[in-house]
Amino acid sequence: MSQSGIQHARVRRALSLALLTASSWVMPQCIVAPATTAAQTNVPLLSQNALNVADYAVAKYDAAMVQSLTQLVSFNTQAVEGQTPDTNPAFMGFKSSLKQLSQELGLDYADHGYVVLIGLDANSAVNNESKKLGIVTHGDVQPANPALWAQSPYLLDTQSEPGKLIGRGTEDDKGAIVTAMYAMKAIKDKHIKRDRRIELLVYLAEESDWEPLKTFLASYTPADMNITIDAEYPVVTAEKGWSKITFTVPNITISNIEAKAEASTQAPTLTAFSGGYFASQVPQQAEAEIEAVSPALLTKLQTRAAAQQGMKYRFENHCVDKLCNLHIFADGKAAHSSTPEDGVNAVTHLAALLSPELNDEPWPKTSASLTVAAMNELVGLGIYAEQFGDLAYKDDFMGPLTLAPTVVVQTQKGTEVTINLRRPVGKTPELLAQQAREALALWQDKHQVQLADIESYWGEPMVMKDAPQQQTLLDVFAHFTGIVNPKPVAIGGSTNSKLFPNALSFGPAMPGVEYTGHTEKEFITHKQFMLNLKMYTAAFIELSAVK
């Protein structure tokens, strides 16, 4: 998710994967490690209670967890403008299912509108109600394009690829909710003495609007120690800031081009260019339309398309007198926009396909051709803002600023472009906004065009230092994976950790494994689902049990 230097993410993942391979890591079926074994293998020793209950949880609740995940995935909990979790039928059904599951598992449940609290009270003789272990998750999801799924994204698919649980929300973040609830149930079953209440917070607008959570936190006392399960292992101590640049390329058509002569020729003309599905997904699909395409130009396009790695193209044409109106469909690879290196951006690759050197003459000036020019000149195929003026920079731990055009859509005003960025520490929002404006001003001067609605937003990066649970979480991860001496990491993603005291992210995704949240093939493997249950059960015990 994050990078240190140009290849930070890939290097870290490669190292993690190498460690997994070197230790012949497999999903442990039964882990009860005596102290002598732990010492001999340099694996941290956890309490016997943590190990026993972790094993019990998997043996007892494997099938029930899959069934519960099936139920939660069935609700399309994406934000709908003008509706709230108390008026949207999908959210109402989702909360009803959470309440029913809480009752079945013997956990308390409280509905606060945008926030649901599910808890397991402390049970030690010295019961301090103000002492809590907070578990932070979210129940809303990003949109899913049904055309790109083998079946409905809201039906848990366990058959098309055995071993995978495929569906929207399986990794981000409904799978984590289910895992936390069954970890709490296993702890309750075994009557583990705890002096901390375990409180699971399920927020219902993490993907769209953090203001209701901020409002809730103004009158709610959160735990003094929190775990967010919405990112990756081993432990996340730094998150980049979610940021964006938006602008609109004005409507320009052949009829109002200054050079009227162009309108009377048969020059090939780029008339439409669009792509992307939502702002925090590297787009898998893009498309363009060109009028007056000659056979020679079509051949050039097809040849260039075949040379692009990771891309697939479909060309549809309607020809009259040897000139064709061409519709190009581009298909890349979706990815979470916090990890643009995991995707193949269909928007930028289609723009590269249509770059001006394709023709002997530049494209006539249209909204589409200007949008393509903006993509090629300000972004290119890179992901680190190398071409966007002076924006590019990096932090030694958090890695570089990343950039991905995510949505290009035609509106009444013109072609609206959304660029999603993830920024590390090292520059102020004011400087970044200034550098973005300067880069866009230079581009506008070059093309003699006035962009509309230029805006930028620069979210705050987070660095969490000295959280008391950090070493315990690292020890749990090391014990169950066999990875020796794991270290905290930074990610490009942005989670609700930023709003809670002493909040660290702990899973559910493994290092060295591509994160599938926000993609059009989101899944979690069954093995990972069960490994997460073991690690969460053990971690909850180690952090809440009476010492």
Language-model segments: residues:
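An extended, acidic, His-containing surface patch that forms the Zn2+-binding/catalytic region
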Residues: N88, S338-T418, R422-E438, Q444-K547
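Acidic-enriched catalytic cores of C-N bond-cleaving enzymes acting on peptides and small amides
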Residues: A238-K240, I245-S274, A279-K333, S337-T406, ...
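Stable alpha-helical elements in mature extracytoplasmic
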Residues: Y61-L69, A90, F94-L98, A176, ...
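Acidic/histidine-rich catalytic neighborhood of metal-dependent amide-processing enzymes
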Residues: D173-K260, P295, I383-F397
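Sec-exported extracytoplasmic/periplasmic mature domains
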Residues: T70-Q78, Q103, K185-D189, S355-P362, ...
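N-terminal helical capping/dimerization or prosegment-like subdomains
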Residues: I31-P146, E416-I419, E430, I524, ...
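Gram-negative bacterial Sec-dependent N-terminal signal peptides
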Residues: M1-C30
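Active-site metal-coordination/substrate-binding segment of hydrolases
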Residues: N128-V202, S208, S219, T519-E520, ...
